[in-house]
């Protein structure tokens, strides 16, 4: 069987890519903010890790892997080309996903909240400062994680293909 269609290897590669992208995104986003935020960043990091892993796995599985197959089926054999196409499509789908989930989940009406001295929740409604910061943060996290996961998947896939073809 051609290594491109070995779904067992594909599943392992996709899982590794999702975890690599998630870990990379979490490190990029959380580690610089830990000294300034103290322990308050740790619960947010845990929340992000639960959000990131399924988003990257679905993004890579639903968008990245089909893009990889389409690029190879069209005659382009470069793993970098397939990785970039998959990463761009996955980033676009993540952008749509993120804009859809931004309106979900309102806090209770009596809740007020501040982050770094800025009020982000006023009487149970997110303030504009909160919405713009959340959108920018979520876009950065989604795009960085998907691209990181797609690149990790492309590199691992290339290694798997070379080993299979060298046998």
Task: Name these PLM-found stretches.
Residues 1-167:
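Juxtamembrane/disordered regions of integral membrane proteins
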